Amino acid sequence: MQTFSTKAQLRAALLKHHRKHDHVVLVPTMGALHAGHRALLEQARKLAGEDGVVVASIFVNPIQFNNSSDLQTYPRTPEKDLEVCEGAGVDYVFSPAPEEMYSGERSIAVEESFLSATLCGASRPGHFSGVCTVLAKLFNLVQPTDAIFGKKDYQQLAIIRRMVRDLDFPVRIHGAEIVRHGNGLAYSSRNARLTPEQKEQAVVIRQAMLQARDEFQAGADASKVKEHAAAMIEGVPGTRIDYLEIVDAETMQPVAENRKPALMAAAVYFGDVRLIDNIEL
Protein backbone atom coordinates (compact mmCIF):
# COMPACT_ATOMS: atom_id res chain seq x y z
CA MET A 1 0.00 0.00 0.00
CA GLN A 2 1.28 3.45 -0.91
CA THR A 3 0.29 6.74 0.70
CA PHE A 4 0.29 10.09 -1.08
CA SER A 5 -0.19 13.61 0.20
CA THR A 6 -0.08 15.54 -3.08
CA LYS A 7 -2.22 15.54 -6.19
CA ALA A 8 0.83 15.15 -8.41
CA GLN A 9 1.93 11.98 -6.61
CA LEU A 10 -1.54 10.47 -6.89
CA ARG A 11 -1.88 11.25 -10.59
CA ALA A 12 1.56 9.82 -11.34
CA ALA A 13 0.75 6.56 -9.55
CA LEU A 14 -2.58 6.14 -11.32
CA LEU A 15 -1.34 6.95 -14.81
CA LYS A 16 -0.26 3.38 -15.61
CA HIS A 17 -3.61 2.01 -14.47
CA HIS A 18 -5.53 4.42 -16.68
CA ARG A 19 -3.35 3.50 -19.65
CA LYS A 20 -4.17 -0.18 -19.11
CA HIS A 21 -7.87 0.61 -18.57
CA ASP A 22 -7.78 -1.08 -15.16
CA HIS A 23 -10.70 -0.91 -12.78
CA VAL A 24 -10.03 1.99 -10.40
CA VAL A 25 -12.38 1.99 -7.41
CA LEU A 26 -12.53 5.06 -5.17
CA VAL A 27 -13.74 5.12 -1.56
CA PRO A 28 -13.82 8.73 -0.31
CA THR A 29 -13.67 9.07 3.49
CA MET A 30 -13.00 11.69 6.14
CA GLY A 31 -10.95 9.27 8.22
CA ALA A 32 -11.74 8.01 11.73
CA LEU A 33 -12.38 4.72 9.97
CA HIS A 34 -14.63 2.10 11.57
CA ALA A 35 -16.37 -1.15 10.63
CA GLY A 36 -18.68 0.67 8.23
CA HIS A 37 -15.75 2.08 6.30
CA ARG A 38 -14.03 -1.30 6.37
CA ALA A 39 -17.08 -2.82 4.67
CA LEU A 40 -16.88 -0.17 1.94
CA LEU A 41 -13.19 -0.84 1.40
CA GLU A 42 -13.69 -4.60 1.28
CA GLN A 43 -16.51 -4.17 -1.23
CA ALA A 44 -14.20 -1.98 -3.29
CA ARG A 45 -11.50 -4.65 -3.21
CA LYS A 46 -13.93 -7.27 -4.54
CA LEU A 47 -15.17 -4.90 -7.21
CA ALA A 48 -11.65 -4.01 -8.37
CA GLY A 49 -10.59 -7.64 -8.62
CA GLU A 50 -7.02 -8.86 -8.76
CA ASP A 51 -6.01 -6.58 -11.62
CA GLY A 52 -7.74 -3.39 -10.49
CA VAL A 53 -6.80 -0.89 -7.80
CA VAL A 54 -8.55 0.56 -4.77
CA VAL A 55 -7.99 4.20 -3.84
CA ALA A 56 -9.09 5.47 -0.43
CA SER A 57 -9.07 9.20 0.23
CA ILE A 58 -8.75 10.38 3.82
CA PHE A 59 -9.57 14.07 4.01
CA VAL A 60 -11.56 16.03 6.58
CA ASN A 61 -13.13 18.38 4.08
CA PRO A 62 -13.36 21.83 5.72
CA ILE A 63 -15.80 23.33 3.23
CA GLN A 64 -18.59 20.87 4.06
CA PHE A 65 -18.71 21.93 7.72
CA ASN A 66 -21.07 24.78 8.56
CA ASN A 67 -19.95 24.72 12.20
CA SER A 68 -16.31 25.46 13.00
CA SER A 69 -16.42 23.64 16.34
CA ASP A 70 -17.73 20.50 14.60
CA LEU A 71 -14.75 20.67 12.25
CA GLN A 72 -12.30 21.10 15.12
CA THR A 73 -13.74 18.22 17.17
CA TYR A 74 -14.22 15.79 14.28
CA PRO A 75 -12.35 12.58 15.26
CA ARG A 76 -8.96 12.02 13.64
CA THR A 77 -7.16 8.66 13.90
CA PRO A 78 -4.54 8.69 11.12
CA GLU A 79 -2.45 5.71 12.23
CA LYS A 80 -5.47 3.48 12.78
CA ASP A 81 -6.91 4.61 9.43
CA LEU A 82 -3.85 3.34 7.57
CA GLU A 83 -4.08 0.01 9.40
CA VAL A 84 -7.73 -0.36 8.38
CA CYS A 85 -6.92 0.49 4.77
CA GLU A 86 -4.04 -1.95 4.59
CA GLY A 87 -6.10 -4.71 6.18
CA ALA A 88 -8.87 -4.20 3.63
CA GLY A 89 -6.51 -4.44 0.66
CA VAL A 90 -6.33 -0.79 -0.35
CA ASP A 91 -3.62 -0.02 -2.91
CA TYR A 92 -3.35 3.76 -2.64
CA VAL A 93 -4.27 6.16 0.17
CA PHE A 94 -4.61 9.83 -0.68
CA SER A 95 -4.38 11.99 2.43
CA PRO A 96 -3.85 15.65 1.46
CA ALA A 97 -3.69 18.75 3.61
CA PRO A 98 -6.48 21.33 3.09
CA GLU A 99 -4.08 23.70 1.32
CA GLU A 100 -3.22 20.94 -1.15
CA MET A 101 -6.87 20.48 -2.07
CA TYR A 102 -7.96 24.12 -2.08
CA SER A 103 -6.40 27.34 -3.25
CA GLY A 104 -6.74 30.32 -0.95
CA GLU A 105 -8.42 32.12 -3.84
CA ARG A 106 -10.97 29.37 -4.54
CA SER A 107 -14.04 30.86 -6.24
CA ILE A 108 -15.67 27.87 -7.95
CA ALA A 109 -18.05 25.45 -6.22
CA VAL A 110 -20.50 22.75 -7.28
CA GLU A 111 -24.07 23.39 -6.15
CA GLU A 112 -27.11 21.08 -6.12
CA SER A 113 -30.42 22.87 -5.76
CA PHE A 114 -33.21 20.29 -5.55
CA LEU A 115 -32.31 17.10 -3.69
CA SER A 116 -30.36 19.13 -1.13
CA ALA A 117 -33.30 21.38 -0.18
CA THR A 118 -34.42 19.11 2.67
CA LEU A 119 -32.98 17.06 5.55
CA CYS A 120 -29.23 17.67 6.05
CA GLY A 121 -29.23 20.21 3.23
CA ALA A 122 -31.78 22.34 5.07
CA SER A 123 -30.23 22.01 8.52
CA ARG A 124 -26.61 22.42 7.37
CA PRO A 125 -26.48 25.24 4.78
CA GLY A 126 -23.59 24.84 2.35
CA HIS A 127 -22.87 21.26 3.43
CA PHE A 128 -23.71 19.57 0.15
CA SER A 129 -21.98 22.22 -1.91
CA GLY A 130 -18.84 21.28 0.01
CA VAL A 131 -19.48 17.58 -0.54
CA CYS A 132 -20.13 17.97 -4.27
CA THR A 133 -17.12 20.23 -4.75
CA VAL A 134 -14.64 17.90 -3.07
CA LEU A 135 -16.06 14.86 -4.87
CA ALA A 136 -15.86 16.61 -8.23
CA LYS A 137 -12.21 17.28 -7.49
CA LEU A 138 -11.58 13.69 -6.40
CA PHE A 139 -13.34 12.29 -9.47
CA ASN A 140 -11.15 14.51 -11.67
CA LEU A 141 -7.97 13.53 -9.81
CA VAL A 142 -8.57 9.79 -9.50
CA GLN A 143 -10.68 9.25 -12.65
CA PRO A 144 -12.28 6.18 -11.06
CA THR A 145 -14.36 3.65 -12.93
CA ASP A 146 -16.38 3.11 -9.76
CA ALA A 147 -16.94 4.81 -6.39
CA ILE A 148 -18.59 3.43 -3.27
CA PHE A 149 -20.61 5.32 -0.64
CA GLY A 150 -22.57 4.18 2.40
CA LYS A 151 -26.36 4.43 2.53
CA LYS A 152 -26.27 5.95 6.02
CA ASP A 153 -25.84 9.26 4.19
CA TYR A 154 -28.80 8.44 1.94
CA GLN A 155 -29.41 12.01 0.82
CA GLN A 156 -25.73 12.41 0.01
CA LEU A 157 -25.81 9.25 -2.11
CA ALA A 158 -28.81 10.56 -4.07
CA ILE A 159 -27.07 13.89 -4.65
CA ILE A 160 -23.85 12.22 -5.80
CA ARG A 161 -25.77 10.11 -8.30
CA ARG A 162 -27.49 13.25 -9.59
CA MET A 163 -24.17 15.09 -9.88
CA VAL A 164 -22.60 12.22 -11.81
CA ARG A 165 -25.60 12.11 -14.13
CA ASP A 166 -25.89 15.85 -14.70
CA LEU A 167 -22.15 16.55 -15.08
CA ASP A 168 -21.37 13.40 -17.09
CA PHE A 169 -18.72 11.97 -14.81
CA PRO A 170 -17.83 8.53 -16.26
CA VAL A 171 -18.03 6.75 -12.90
CA ARG A 172 -20.42 4.11 -11.59
CA ILE A 173 -21.79 4.93 -8.12
CA HIS A 174 -22.45 2.07 -5.71
CA GLY A 175 -24.43 2.33 -2.47
CA ALA A 176 -23.43 0.05 0.42
CA GLU A 177 -25.78 -1.07 3.18
CA ILE A 178 -25.52 0.49 6.65
CA VAL A 179 -23.28 -1.42 9.06
CA ARG A 180 -24.62 -1.54 12.60
CA HIS A 181 -23.56 -2.56 16.08
CA GLY A 182 -25.34 -5.57 17.55
CA ASN A 183 -27.84 -3.26 19.28
CA GLY A 184 -28.77 -1.55 16.01
CA LEU A 185 -26.77 1.68 16.37
CA ALA A 186 -25.27 2.65 13.02
CA TYR A 187 -21.49 2.89 12.93
CA SER A 188 -20.36 6.51 12.74
CA SER A 189 -17.08 8.31 13.29
CA ARG A 190 -18.98 10.61 15.65
CA ASN A 191 -19.88 7.69 17.92
CA ALA A 192 -16.40 8.08 19.42
CA ARG A 193 -17.57 11.33 21.03
CA LEU A 194 -20.55 9.73 22.79
CA THR A 195 -20.41 8.83 26.47
CA PRO A 196 -21.19 5.18 27.35
CA GLU A 197 -24.65 6.29 28.48
CA GLN A 198 -25.27 8.19 25.24
CA LYS A 199 -24.23 5.16 23.19
CA GLU A 200 -26.98 3.19 24.91
CA GLN A 201 -29.48 6.01 24.46
CA ALA A 202 -28.67 6.44 20.76
CA VAL A 203 -30.17 3.02 20.01
CA VAL A 204 -33.56 4.74 20.24
CA ILE A 205 -33.11 6.11 16.70
CA ARG A 206 -33.08 2.62 15.22
CA GLN A 207 -35.89 1.46 17.51
CA ALA A 208 -38.09 4.38 16.48
CA MET A 209 -37.40 3.74 12.82
CA LEU A 210 -38.22 0.04 13.02
CA GLN A 211 -41.52 0.97 14.68
CA ALA A 212 -42.10 3.55 11.94
CA ARG A 213 -41.54 0.98 9.21
CA ASP A 214 -44.02 -1.41 10.80
CA GLU A 215 -46.66 1.32 11.12
CA PHE A 216 -46.09 2.60 7.58
CA GLN A 217 -46.32 -0.86 6.08
CA ALA A 218 -49.56 -1.39 8.02
CA GLY A 219 -51.02 1.63 6.21
CA ALA A 220 -50.66 4.44 8.76
CA ASP A 221 -50.46 8.04 7.54
CA ALA A 222 -46.95 9.44 7.23
CA SER A 223 -47.76 12.24 9.67
CA LYS A 224 -48.84 9.78 12.38
CA VAL A 225 -45.83 7.56 11.79
CA LYS A 226 -43.53 10.55 12.14
CA GLU A 227 -45.32 11.78 15.26
CA HIS A 228 -44.95 8.41 17.00
CA ALA A 229 -41.26 8.11 16.08
CA ALA A 230 -40.53 11.62 17.35
CA ALA A 231 -42.27 10.89 20.64
CA MET A 232 -40.17 7.77 21.16
CA ILE A 233 -36.91 9.63 20.51
CA GLU A 234 -37.86 12.66 22.60
CA GLY A 235 -38.73 10.34 25.46
CA VAL A 236 -35.02 9.72 26.00
CA PRO A 237 -33.41 12.38 28.26
CA GLY A 238 -30.82 14.63 26.65
CA THR A 239 -31.95 14.13 23.06
CA ARG A 240 -32.79 16.88 20.59
CA ILE A 241 -34.20 16.19 17.14
CA ASP A 242 -32.58 18.25 14.40
CA TYR A 243 -34.94 16.78 11.82
CA LEU A 244 -37.17 13.73 11.46
CA GLU A 245 -38.87 13.41 8.09
CA ILE A 246 -40.54 10.95 5.78
CA VAL A 247 -39.50 11.75 2.23
CA ASP A 248 -39.76 10.31 -1.25
CA ALA A 249 -36.72 8.03 -1.49
CA GLU A 250 -35.91 9.33 -4.97
CA THR A 251 -36.64 13.06 -4.77
CA MET A 252 -35.93 13.65 -1.04
CA GLN A 253 -39.14 15.73 -0.89
CA PRO A 254 -41.46 15.32 2.13
CA VAL A 255 -44.50 13.08 1.69
CA ALA A 256 -47.70 13.36 3.72
CA GLU A 257 -49.47 10.26 2.47
CA ASN A 258 -48.63 6.57 2.65
CA ARG A 259 -46.88 5.79 -0.62
CA LYS A 260 -43.63 4.31 -1.83
CA PRO A 261 -40.75 4.62 -2.38
CA ALA A 262 -40.50 6.31 1.01
CA LEU A 263 -37.66 6.89 3.43
CA MET A 264 -37.57 8.01 7.04
CA ALA A 265 -34.46 10.04 7.78
CA ALA A 266 -33.39 11.63 11.04
CA ALA A 267 -30.64 13.69 12.61
CA VAL A 268 -30.63 13.63 16.40
CA TYR A 269 -28.37 15.32 18.93
CA PHE A 270 -27.16 13.44 22.00
CA GLY A 271 -25.55 16.23 23.96
CA ASP A 272 -23.55 18.05 21.29
CA VAL A 273 -23.04 14.96 19.10
CA ARG A 274 -25.23 14.82 16.00
CA LEU A 275 -26.07 11.37 14.60
CA ILE A 276 -27.95 10.53 11.41
CA ASP A 277 -29.77 7.39 10.34
CA ASN A 278 -32.49 6.30 7.94
CA ILE A 279 -34.73 3.42 6.99
CA GLU A 280 -36.52 2.55 3.77
CA LEU A 281 -40.23 2.26 4.48
Swiss-Prot record:
<keyword id="KW-0547">Nucleotide-binding</keyword>
<feature type="binding site">
    <location>
        <position position="64"/>
    </location>
    <ligand>
        <name>(R)-pantoate</name>
    </ligand>
</feature>
<comment type="function">
    <text>Catalyzes the condensation of pantoate with beta-alanine in an ATP-dependent reaction via a pantoyl-adenylate intermediate.</text>
</comment>
<feature type="active site" description="Proton donor">
    <location>
        <position position="37"/>
    </location>
</feature>
<protein>
    <recommendedName>
        <fullName>Pantothenate synthetase</fullName>
        <ecNumber>6.3.2.1</ecNumber>
    </recommendedName>
</protein>
<comment type="similarity">
    <text>Belongs to the pantothenate synthetase family.</text>
</comment>
<dbReference type="GO" id="GO:0004592">
    <property type="term" value="F:pantoate-beta-alanine ligase activity"/>
</dbReference>
<feature type="binding site">
    <location>
        <begin position="187"/>
        <end position="190"/>
    </location>
    <ligand>
        <name>ATP</name>
    </ligand>
</feature>
<dbReference type="InterPro" id="IPR004821">
    <property type="entry name" value="Cyt_trans-like"/>
</dbReference>
<keyword id="KW-0566">Pantothenate biosynthesis</keyword>
<keyword id="KW-0963">Cytoplasm</keyword>
<feature type="binding site">
    <location>
        <begin position="150"/>
        <end position="153"/>
    </location>
    <ligand>
        <name>ATP</name>
    </ligand>
</feature>
<feature type="binding site">
    <location>
        <begin position="30"/>
        <end position="37"/>
    </location>
    <ligand>
        <name>ATP</name>
    </ligand>
</feature>
<dbReference type="GO" id="GO:0015940">
    <property type="term" value="P:pantothenate biosynthetic process"/>
</dbReference>
<dbReference type="GO" id="GO:0005829">
    <property type="term" value="C:cytosol"/>
</dbReference>
<dbReference type="Pfam" id="PF02569">
    <property type="entry name" value="Pantoate_ligase"/>
</dbReference>
<dbReference type="InterPro" id="IPR042176">
    <property type="entry name" value="Pantoate_ligase_C"/>
</dbReference>
<feature type="binding site">
    <location>
        <position position="64"/>
    </location>
    <ligand>
        <name>beta-alanine</name>
    </ligand>
</feature>
<comment type="pathway">
    <text>Cofactor biosynthesis; (R)-pantothenate biosynthesis; (R)-pantothenate from (R)-pantoate and beta-alanine: step 1/1.</text>
</comment>
<keyword id="KW-0436">Ligase</keyword>
<dbReference type="InterPro" id="IPR014729">
    <property type="entry name" value="Rossmann-like_a/b/a_fold"/>
</dbReference>
<comment type="subunit">
    <text>Homodimer.</text>
</comment>
<keyword id="KW-0067">ATP-binding</keyword>
<dbReference type="GO" id="GO:0005524">
    <property type="term" value="F:ATP binding"/>
</dbReference>
<dbReference type="InterPro" id="IPR003721">
    <property type="entry name" value="Pantoate_ligase"/>
</dbReference>
<feature type="binding site">
    <location>
        <position position="179"/>
    </location>
    <ligand>
        <name>ATP</name>
    </ligand>
</feature>
<feature type="binding site">
    <location>
        <position position="156"/>
    </location>
    <ligand>
        <name>(R)-pantoate</name>
    </ligand>
</feature>
